[in-house]
UniProtKB/Swiss-Prot annotation:
Record GO biological process: amino acid metabolic process; pyridoxal phosphate biosynthetic process; pyridoxine biosynthetic process
InterPro entries linked to this entry: Aldolase_TIM, PdxS/SNZ, PdxS/SNZ_N, RibuloseP-bd_barrel
GO MF assignments: pyridoxal 5'-phosphate synthase (glutamine hydrolysing) activity
Record's protein name: Pyridoxal 5'-phosphate synthase subunit PdxS
Keywords from the named record: Lyase, Pyridoxal phosphate, Schiff base
Primary role: Catalyzes the formation of pyridoxal 5'-phosphate from ribose 5-phosphate (RBP), glyceraldehyde 3-phosphate (G3P) and ammonia. The ammonia is provided by the PdxT subunit. Can also use ribulose 5-phosphate and dihydroxyacetone phosphate as substrates, resulting from enzyme-catalyzed isomerization of RBP and G3P, respectively.
Subunit structure: In the presence of PdxT, forms a dodecamer of heterodimers.
Key word Lyase present: yes
Residues binding D-ribose 5-phosphate: 36, 165, 226, 247-248
Major enzyme class: lyase
Length: 306
């Protein structure tokens, strides 16, 4: 079998990655933890704790939420510092719809780009055309329709959104359960009803039929938003996540290095209560957090994207 790496489009002579390679790169992260870091020192702590990748950004979601204002792509020097500090893959965030930020991140050599609702959207109508890039993209989703639309645009990994920067896992569970529930519902439909389902999901029929036949997304499904403890990570894995993003929950806690290692172990041994109890001991204070229900609707980050 021939291996695909990239293709050059004749119209532009631009090299773009194939879906097989992009999705394969995301597959390599399955079962792991991806941690938000703001300094090279934090990146090293994450790597030493067993993170499969780090997300380089100037402010963790809790600080973005607290400080307000317009949140944009991180400074290239800061991203370079983290890339040079670790040997594991480095992700970075671009604003929804901001294809030039994505072009810059690709030029910097990041391994993955997160088109993220945590940053202030640059376009309230269009997401980035992710097929035009060699680097794979990860995108958030709160339901199956949103996930399928992002995959149609070229996303190689989906993460259920949750509510970033809160330390409240409730929205993460809601979104993961909803995506999984909608997949099961789709798989139970007779084939002639998939056309209507595709219309309702606002997604291509061929992609809807593939999900119905396989019972899963064609890309990796991680979870994110509000995961602050080993138990949170393990619960999300038991609910069907294939890996975990942890943002503010580690470096806003009392003992980041120990908590990072504990969350990695909990993600690996998510179905072993004895291991979970052991790694949950003596972690110190978790991030204080915010109850999602107390956040006004306009300030909920998960509402961004469509």
């Amino acid at each position: 079998m021939t291996q695909e790496f990239a293709v050059t489009t004749p119209e532009t002579t631009q090299t773009v990655g194939t879906a097989r390679v992009k999705r394969g790169m995301a597959e390599m992260l399955k079962g792991g933890v991806i941690m938000d870091v703001v300094t090279p020192e934090q990146a090293k702590i994450a790597e030493d704790a067993g993170a499969v990748a780090v997300m380089a950004l100037e402010r963790v979601p809790a600080d973005i939420r607290a400080q307000g204002g317009v949140s944009r792509m991180s400074d290239p020097d800061m991203i370079d510092g983290i890339i040079n500090a670790v040997s594991i893959p480095v992700m970075a965030k671009a604003r929804i719809g901001h294809f030039v930020e994505a072009q810059i991140l690709q030029s910097l050599g990041v391994d993955y780009i997160d088109e993220s609702e945590v940053l202030t959207p640059a376009d309230y109508t269009n997401h980035i055309d992710k097929w035009q890039f060699t680097v794979p993209f990860v995108c958030g989703a709160t339901n199956l329709g949103e996930a399928l639309r992002r995959i149609t645009e070229g996303a190689a990994m989906i993460r259920s959104k949750g509510e970033a920067g809160t330390g409240d896992v409730s929205n993460a569970t809601t979104h993961m359960r909803k995506i999984r529930q909608e997949i099961r519902k789709l798989a139970a439909l007779p084939e002639d009803e998939l056309y209507v389902a595709a219309k309702e999901l606002q997604a291509p029929y061929e992609l809807v039929r593939e999900v119905a036949e396989t019972g899963k997304l064609p890309v990796v499904l991680f979870t994110a938003g509000g995961i602050a403890t080993p138990a949170d990570a393990a619960m999300m894995m038991q609910l069907g996540a294939e890996g975990v993003f942890v943002g503010s929950g580690i470096f806003k806690s009392g003992n980041p290095a120990q908590r990072a290692e504990a969350i990695v172990k909990a993600t690996t041994f998510y179905d072993d209560p004895d291991v979970l109890a052991k790694v949950s001991r003596g972690l110190g204070e978790a991030m204080v957090g915010i109850n999602v229900e107390e956040i006004p609707q306009p300030h909920r980050l998960a509402e961004r994207g469509w």
